[in-house]
């Protein structure tokens, strides 16, 4: 009969090599994934920092009736940088999302896939939070610019309601603000100059908001659909932490009780030894 031991051993070694290759490939894939996660997190942090800088520029521009061009250019650069970085983040998150959907379509389920889904959900939520802050910052700045325009119109003797001013802004025509204003004083001219400056800022803002609107809504809807899953994960994590803390507490109590019991046993043994010595001495004295 032919001995197939060597053949079987070779086949087993080949299977082992395949398993090692798969494991190494999977580990390399996850390493690359986590590098991508860190890159995305860095981009989101950069957006957050730029948003804070945008707030400072807004305050500087509003503090001056005629802000210098350098400050306005720096603000535009910040807004442009936020837009570019946000598009990068969106593209990378979309890529991860598609990869996850492909694996789910093949009915694959693994710890690695769950990790990737959790990371993707966390990053998506963080991204939307940062962009929401940026959107709120822009909206607040628009309202402040609008308020300044209204005050300057009042200086020229022209009173407008909030609704009327909104209609004027939506017209996109700067000349509409000069209508009915008598340009007979330097105050009126200065007021009109600031009105035109603020109106220009509002137009830029609205263009920026419009450009980011579709991306923002897309990511917001994604996060909303993931919300329930994220809440469930957070609930499980919190309860796992509580369980671990209780387990540690119970372990400490057990060690404490065990230590007390051990000390009691030692005391009993010592008492028995002392009692034995006393009895032995007593009987020794009697029979001595």
Swiss-Prot record:
The chain crosses the membrane at residues 266-288. InterPro entries: SNARE (IPR010989), Syntaxin (IPR045242), Syntaxin/epimorphin_CS (IPR006012), Syntaxin_N (IPR006011), T_SNARE_dom (IPR000727). The keyword Iron does not apply. One of its GO terms (biological process) is positive regulation of norepinephrine secretion. SUPFAM superfamilies: t-snare proteins. The modification Phosphoserine is found at residues 14, 64, 95, 188. Residues 68-109 form a coiled coil. Residues 192-254 form the t-SNARE coiled-coil homology domain. Phosphorylated by CK2. Phosphorylation at Ser-188 by DAPK1 significantly decreases its interaction with STXBP1. Sumoylated, sumoylation is required for regulation of synaptic vesicle endocytosis. It is found in: Cytoplasmic vesicle, Secretory vesicle, Synaptic vesicle membrane; Synapse, Synaptosome; Cell membrane. Keywords: Cell membrane, Coiled coil, Cytoplasmic vesicle, Exocytosis, Isopeptide bond, Membrane, Neurotransmitter transport, Phosphoprotein, Synapse, Synaptosome, Transmembrane, Transmembrane helix, Transport, Ubl conjugation. Part of the SNARE core complex containing SNAP25, VAMP2 and STX1A; this complex constitutes the basic catalytic machinery of the complex neurotransmitter release apparatus. The SNARE complex interacts with CPLX1. Interacts with STXBP1. The interaction with STXBP1 promotes assembly of the SNARE complex. Interacts (via C-terminus) with KCNB1 (via C-terminus); the interaction increases in a calcium-dependent manner and induces a pore-independent enhancement of exocytosis in neuroendocrine cells, chromaffin cells, pancreatic beta cells and from the soma of dorsal root ganglia (DRG) neurons. Plays an essential role in hormone and neurotransmitter calcium-dependent exocytosis and endocytosis. Part of the SNARE (Soluble NSF Attachment Receptor) complex composed of SNAP25, STX1A and VAMP2 which mediates the fusion of synaptic vesicles with the presynaptic plasma membrane. STX1A and SNAP25 are localized on the plasma membrane while VAMP2 resides in synaptic vesicles. The pairing of the three SNAREs from the N-terminal SNARE motifs to the C-terminal anchors leads to the formation of the SNARE complex, which brings membranes into close proximity and results in final fusion. This is Syntaxin-1A. It comes from Bos taurus.
């Amino acid at each position: 009969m032919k001995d197939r031991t060597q053949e079987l051993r070779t086949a087993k070694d080949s299977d082992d090599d395949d398993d090692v290759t798969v494991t190494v490939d999977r580990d390399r894939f996850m390493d690359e994934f986590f590098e991508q996660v860190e890159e995305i997190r860095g981009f989101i942090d950069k957006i957050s920092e730029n948003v804070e800088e945008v707030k400072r520029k807004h305050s500087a521009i509003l503090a001056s009736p005629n802000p210098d061009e350098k400050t306005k250019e720096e603000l535009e650069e910040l807004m442009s940088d936020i837009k570019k970085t946000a598009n990068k983040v969106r593209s990378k998150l979309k890529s991860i999302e598609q990869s996850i959907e492909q694996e789910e379509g093949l009915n694959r389920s693994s710890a690695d896939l769950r990790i990737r889904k959790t990371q993707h959900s966390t990053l998506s939520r963080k991204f939307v939070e940062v962009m929401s802050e940026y959107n709120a910052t822009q909206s607040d700045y628009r309202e402040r610019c609008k308020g300044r325009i209204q005050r300057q119109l009042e200086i020229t003797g022209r009173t407008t309601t909030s609704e009327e001013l909104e209609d004027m802004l939506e017209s996109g025509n700067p000349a509409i603000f000069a209508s009915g204003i008598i340009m007979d004083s330097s105050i009126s001219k200065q007021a009109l100059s600031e009105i035109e400056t603020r109106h220009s800022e509002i137009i830029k803002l609205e263009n920026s908001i419009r450009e980011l609107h579709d991306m923002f809504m897309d990511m917001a809807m994604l996060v909303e659909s993931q919300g329930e899953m994220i809440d469930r994960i957070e609930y499980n994590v919190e309860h796992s932490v509580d369980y671990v803390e209780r387990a540690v507490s119970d372990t400490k109590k057990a060690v404490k009780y065990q230590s007390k019991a051990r000390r009691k046993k030692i005391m009993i043994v010592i008492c028995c030894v002392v009692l034995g010595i006393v009895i032995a001495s007593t009987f020794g004295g009697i029979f001595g």
